[in-house]
A protein has these predicted regions:
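An extracytoplasmic/periplasmic, membrane-proximal ligand-sensing/linker region
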Residues: 9, 17-18, 22, 55-57, ...
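Aromatic (phenylalanine/tyrosine) cluster motif
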Residues: 11-12, 49
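N-terminal export leaders
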Residues: 28-33
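N-terminal signal peptide c-region/cleavage motif recognized by signal peptidases
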Residues: 45-47
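N-terminal (or domain-start) structured segment
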Residues: 49-140, 179, 187, 203-232, ...
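Hinge/capping helix and adjacent helix->loop/strand transition within the periplasmic-binding protein
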Residues: 108-114, 129-216, 265, 270, ...
Length: 352
């Protein structure tokens, strides 16, 4: 591409008489023109690449086994996005190590828009604080594409606990030091971290009971073996409506669509950021993927999640659909990062 003469060229004339250009000025001008030409070529090449994208199938890496909730949603989104992108989207399940294996594969893939990650907040954010030898850096190696949905949890209590809201619960556990037990279903997951933080902040010395899954934890809540716990709406909504569990409040920034009458803990005055964060589901890409391609992908994800059948599927999983973009998702991660780091360090949780 021909480079037009620089307007700065006029400054090298003295009156109407042309003077020899000093060597350093000549080199500066040539360097500037060369840089401008390279930048223009790079921009043109990137723009052309983005306009031609995609011209082959796109792989979505799901770092979990086939048949799980994340995998099912990935296939639903892939079907919808294929229409808008005009190319097949192929699911590639790479389970193992709490999402690390699949996420690492994406982190090391070519940043060309043909390999995507559909992951959870653990592999894309919190694992870096739980593992000392994580093979990738979420911030350095994964580019945010779109935060699909968040998964706030419900803080529930056994009916024998004489409280009905967050502030009352904090007073109760402080007044009954060492007498209250909370449950969780995964070291380093939010129910564990939030319970540990609540206990420490109130000097309550609550007992932590770890379960191999959410269902057995809820069963012990129903039986009164433990008194409180954070759980998904899917697991506890029916028990709340039947009066078998008390809904104390919801984590996250806003009320859950499936439990609209249960206020957030923040609404109740528990303003610590520890009660405002929640797990999430999102798309990522290898760092270095051209911004225009990230925006194109984000647009197609948004279109897919706005379709009623997809939105209903996400809600059925206990997630709340988000309106997102690469910039909004990146900002959310920057905001949440220190909160999760603080919670994990306070709990002492490690996974390696």
């Amino acid at each position: 591409m021909a480079v037009q003469p620089s307007p700065l060229g006029g400054f090298f004339h003295h009156h109407n008489r042309r003077q020899p250009m000093p060597l350093h000025s000549l080199m500066t001008r040539r360097t500037w023109l060369g840089a401008a030409a390279l930048a223009a070529a790079a921009c043109t090449g990137t723009a052309a690449f983005a306009q031609a994208y995609p011209n082959k199938p796109i792989k979505i890496v799901v770092p979990f086994a086939a048949g799980g909730a994340t995998d099912v949603l990935a296939r639903v989104l892939a079907e919808k996005m294929t229409v808008g992108l005009g190319q097949p989207m192929v699911i590639d399940n790479k389970p193992g190590a709490a999402g690390i294996i699949g996420t690492d594969a994406v982190a090391k893939a070519a940043p060309d828009g043909y390999t995507l990650l559909l992951g959870l907040s653990n592999s894309m954010l919190t694992n870096q604080f739980l593992y000392t030898k994580l093979p990738y850096s979420p911030e350095r190696d994964i580019a945010p594409v779109y935060q699909i949905a968040i998964a706030p949890l419900v803080l529930v209590a056994h009916p024998s606990v004489p409280v009905s809201n967050g502030p009352e619960l904090l007073k109760y556990i402080a007044a009954n030091k060492g007498k209250v037990a909370y449950g969780s279903y995964g070291t380093g997951a939010y129910p564990h971290l939030a319970g540990a933080y609540m206990s420490q902040s109130q000097n309550a010395d609550m007992s932590h009971v770890a379960y191999r899954g959410e269902a057995p934890m809820v069963q012990d809540l129903l039986g009164g073996q433990i008194q409180i716990g954070f759980a998904s709406a899917l697991q506890v909504k029916a028990h709340i409506e039947a009066g078998k569990l008390k809904a104390i409040g919801v984590s996250g920034e806003r009320r859950m669509g499936t439990l609209p009458n249960v206020p957030t803990l923040a609404e109740q005055g528990l303003n610590d950021e520890a009660y405002r964060v929640a797990g999430w589901l999102a798309f990522g890409a290898p760092a270095g993927t051209p911004p225009a391609i990230l925006e194109r992908l984000a647009t197609e994800v948004r279109k897919a999640t706005e379709q009623p059948d997809v939105a209903q599927r996400i809600a059925a999983m206990g997630f709340d659909v988000q309106k997102s973009s690469p910039a909004l998702f990146a900002a959310a991660m920057v905001k949440e990062r220190p909160v999760w780091e603080r919670l994990i360090k306070a709990s002492g949780a490690t996974l390696d």
